[in-house]
Structures are given as structure tokens and as C-alpha cells.
């Protein structure tokens, strides 16, 4: 193995060459199918190698592009989740007429089932030895909870208030089922990314979801998409992937 020495540290590197660039060392490594199957499991990698029989290099590139695409979605996902949560909480406070809005779930017919999310959040906070506050409960609740508020089961009770969380939505889209459809689509993509699942199989679809998410952000606040676009790298990463994969 080659020995890489840098800033007082030595460690073995199994690679083909070392090169220097602006004071940094770039290690050019050879990674094979065996490496990826060992690190990420043969089952996870199977779909990639089956897609490119006889071309391990392209299969590996595809897997790496999946990681790149997942990483590039995080700014949009994280901003959307926080914006949605805060917009919805504002309307739930108005609905409940109290800051600890979740308290009314346990006594409101039709909403009692939602109390299970609140109980779970409280248990998780208590398990960390922290004080249970409204802010911490709000932060602890999952995307699944926020999305569930737009289910058909709660339309009669909640929709007339929750629709005000989207003051800039066009009239044609000002329907619970439209909002719920988008939120569930975003949640499914987010869950796949969080569980390191494949999302880079239909790049057109992921690009569409990213655009839809930016659009729905604008339904809540017109300025958020403009602000996020200043540092969101999704479009450039997506373009890079198309070049890498020759798509």
C-alpha cells in the first residue's frame, strides 16, 4: 500500500496514485463491485449492477449520483418542512385559541387519534431529560404528523383553518386533496432519501418534485423560493448527473 503523509499524520492508502492541488492531496482510488457490496450490501447494489451488465464502472457512477442527488435535495426539503410546520402551527393556534394548540386534540371529537403523535413526542422529549414545552413538542413532531392533518378524515374540522396556511395559492389549487397530494408526494421522497434508498432512477420525476416543492413554498410565502434559490444547488447537481451518466 502507498503511504500518505500530510500535516504530521501517516496512514496507509491502497490507491493508484497521489496528486497535489493547491496544497491539498487528492487520492485517486480504484473502487470495485466487491468494495460497494461489502460496504453497502450486495442486496442494495444489486439493482445498479443488473441495470448495467458488464459495466461495473457505470453502475458505480449511478450509485454515486444517487448520493449526490439526495444530498442536493436537502436544502429544499429542510426549508420546506420548517416552513410548513410554522405555517400550520400558526393556524392551529388560531383554531385552538391557545398557544399549546395540541391540547385540544384529546377533547375534540374527530381529532383524538392525533393525540398519539403528541404522546410520542412528549415521551421522546422526556427520555432525553428535557422539559416538555410547546416549542419542543412542535419540533419533535414528524413530517408524517404534519401531512396527516390534511387527510380527508380531518377535512370537516381542520381544513377551513389550515387552508389559510397557504395564502398565495391559486384558487384552482385551494383544495385539501390538492395540498395533501403534494405533501404526501414530498414526504415519500424525503423518506426514501432519509433511508438511503434509490431516487436517481427517474431524474425527470425528481426534478419535477423539486420544482413542485419550490412552488408550494411560494403558496405559504412568496419570498421563500427566491431566497432559497440563492444557494440551492439542486439544478446544477442534476445537470452534472446528466453529464456524468450521459442522460
What would you call each of these model-derived segments?
Residues 1-181, 185, 203-247:
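Extended intrinsically disordered or low-complexity regions, especially N/C-terminal cytosolic tails and loops
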Amino acid at each position: 500500500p502507498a503511504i500518505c503523509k500530510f500535516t504530521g499524520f501517516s496512514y496507509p492508502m491502497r490507491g493508484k496514485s497521489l496528486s497535489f492541488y493547491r496544497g491539498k492531496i487528492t487520492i485517486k482510488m480504484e473502487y470495485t463491485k466487491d468494495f460497494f457490496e461489502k460496504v453497502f450490501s450486495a442486496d442494495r447494489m444489486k439493482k445498479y449492477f443488473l441495470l448495467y451488465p458488464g459495466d461495473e464502472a457505470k453502475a458505480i457512477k449511478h450509485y454515486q449520483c444517487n448520493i449526490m442527488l439526495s444530498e442536493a435535495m436537502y436544502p429544499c426539503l429542510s426549508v420546506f418542512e420548517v416552513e410548513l410546520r410554522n405555517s400550520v402551527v400558526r393556524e392551529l393556534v388560531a383554531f385552538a385559541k391557545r398557544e399549546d394548540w395540541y391540547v385540544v386534540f384529546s377533547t375534540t371529537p374527530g381529532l383524538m387519534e392525533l393525540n398519539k403523535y403528541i404522546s410520542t413526542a412528549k415521551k421522546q422529549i422526556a427520555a432525553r431529560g428535557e422539559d416538555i414545552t410547546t416549542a419542543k413538542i412542535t419540533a419533535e413532531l414528524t413530517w408524517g404528523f404534519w401531512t396527516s392533518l390534511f387527510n380527508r378524515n380531518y377535512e370537516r374540522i381542520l381544513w377551513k383553518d389550515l387552508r389559510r396556511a397557504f395564502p398565495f395559492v391559486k384558487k384552482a389549487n385551494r383544495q385539501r386533496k390538492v395540498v395533501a397530494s403534494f405533501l404526501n408526494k414530498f414526504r415519500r421522497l424525503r423518506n426514501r432519501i432519509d433511508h438511503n434508498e434509490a431516487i436517481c432512477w427517474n431524474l425527470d420525476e425528481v426534478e419535477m418534485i423539486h420544482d413542485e416543492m419550490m412552488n408550494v413554498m411560494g403558496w405559504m410565502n412568496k419570498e421563500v423560493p427566491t431566497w432559497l434559490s440563492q444557494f440551492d444547488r439542486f439544478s446544477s447537481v442534476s445537470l452534472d448527473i446528466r453529464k456524468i451518466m450521459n442522460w
